């Protein structure tokens, strides 16, 4: 059954979200139209504002409405000479939620993927290299995802950093806290054994 053009357009637009198929998009559209038009209007307003006003931080490339994000603009960050390299702005939020890192970030907005046309320029690596060349960075922590592409990206950045007298490390990978060994994949187990620590 076909709906009105505006309802169809709303359903099609909602399908652009990750993990949202036709049925989920239809349920969301009907929820907003049938039960919560005020929330729908609020969503439309917030989405419109974000699409027009949110850009990328000129220093770290995370999302912000300003020239610099709050982290890069802060003079209270303890380890401003330490940069943690992540793939997405969501990774910044995850690390910040842990509260164990007080340095700055550099957001790649992806990972190296030559088959998809994503090379060093698309990841902003020339900006990262400019940070390293400034002499203000003492350590680079690579927190890319533990995937083939994430590993390749980390190795590329580590090689790039070699000429700048910067300490480079990679976050540890292994068995998650609260995880049970029988459910852990073999690659993660291998990383856990290779990265074991003395007690």
UniProtKB/Swiss-Prot annotation:
Keywords: DNA damage, DNA recombination, DNA repair, Metal-binding, Zinc, Zinc-finger. Residues 81-176 form the Toprim domain. CDD domains: TOPRIM_recR (cd01025). GO terms for molecular function: DNA binding; zinc ion binding. GO terms for biological process: DNA recombination; DNA repair. The keyword Ribosomal protein does not apply. A zinc finger (C4-type) spans 57-72. May play a role in DNA repair. It seems to be involved in an RecBC-independent recombinational process of DNA repair. It may act with RecF and RecO. Belongs to the RecR family. This is Recombination protein RecR. The gene is recR.
